[in-house]
Amino acid sequence: MKPLKLKKLILEVHETSIFIILIFKTTDKNTIITHVRHVRHELLYKIFANITRLKTVLNFTGIDPFSHKLSPGILDLIKIIIASFTLAPLRLYCIFNLLCLTWFVAKIGLLCTNNKKTNEKPFSGWRRVLQIFIRKVFRAVFFCMGFHSIKISGDKSSKEKAPILVCAPHATIVDAIAVFASGSVPVAKQGVAKMYFIGPVFSFIQSLFVTREAASSRQQTVDQIKSRACDLEAETSSSHKWPQVFIFPEGTCTNSRALIKFKSGAFQPGIPVQPVLIKRDLNTLDTLTWTWNQSYGELVCLWLTCCQFSNSIEIEFMKVYEPNLEEREDPRLFASNVRALMAARLGIPTVERSVSEFTNDGGSAWSINNQKTSSKVQEYPYVIDFVGNLTQT
């Protein structure tokens, strides 16, 4: 074993021992957090799952939602090596051809249209048929990636009951499965529109694009969400109505181990929303997650996913959430309560931080009361919300 690895292992054992001793010796949370350094929280949580005090402290210190580390075993590595020369190239070849097909169809659909006016009213006639065709082709794309069957639980509500679908946790580009499975229109960042293959497709299905850095763009997107949700500019005929708006309120990809602060855009109209959950088996080799702090990018993520013989994902449609008067007047409260309900259903905590705070801080550690701490300390304060603490009138 290399000296550096041995030193790191000794440090981990030492700090973990201090952490466990402090849990049983002191009642001061600040003292405990001060001594937390590189402690493997998840492992401790599993070992001492029945100890209430340890649960409380671990939930308080939390888990970094923006980091992901792939830890393949020997068998996983063997499968990846074999699939890299057999299964993955075949799958990627099929995916490439299907994406070319969707790009070609989208380009045909966008002929004789003004890019600035594509979102003024929903497409109808032959363009609507092409939109449906593209959704079917994308289902074939996901099949080629190994998603042979997608488990869908719950019932998707009608637009009259819930004009907006809010989905979490958002961990990977594969989450687009939920968009196409629901037949809705997504809200995406402006960068998606510039992607060569994907951009024209998302433009043709009339996605809403938002520039996060520009306040005017965000407000314009909110106005468009309100317009589409209420069909203010559409005809009364069902064939000329906008489909439901699909939003990932977290606004970025996380590792699915906690729900970060929801952006309020989806909740500003003050109308009912239907929460949608994406469930993945985090106990298996997680090749799907693509977040901020990991050692490989989206292309490697796609390659590793195609190396898996079969991938599983579950989409659950929860009951429609109707805001009360207080929530209609306060979008942040509305968003917080919906997030609490979704987190409770998923069995994961919520963290009172957003990706903008993480990136503005350069990805450094967060601490209680936003105070800077040593770079060695990884502290992510959580707030646990359960259904029992959620009141709705």
PLM features per residue range, with description:
Residues 1-41:
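Intrinsically disordered, low-complexity basic segments at termini and long loops, enriched
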Residues 94, 151, 165-167, 178-180, ...:
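Beta-strand cores of modular interaction/reader domains in eukaryotic scaffold and signaling proteins
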Residues 196-204, 240-244, 251-333, 349-376:
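A cross-family acyltransferase "interaction/gating" segment
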Residues 103-149, 158-220:
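Catalytic core of membrane glycerolipid acyltransferases/transacylases, capturing the structured
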Residues 1-5, 10, 36, 44, ...:
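Cytosol/nucleoplasm-facing, intrinsically disordered, low-complexity tails
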Residues 225, 334-345:
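Short amphipathic C-terminal alpha-helix that caps PH/PH-like domains
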Residues 2, 28, 40-146, 372-374, ...:
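N-terminal membrane-anchoring alpha-helices
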Residues 80, 91, 150-154, 159, ...:
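Eukaryotic intrinsically disordered and solvent-exposed regulatory patches
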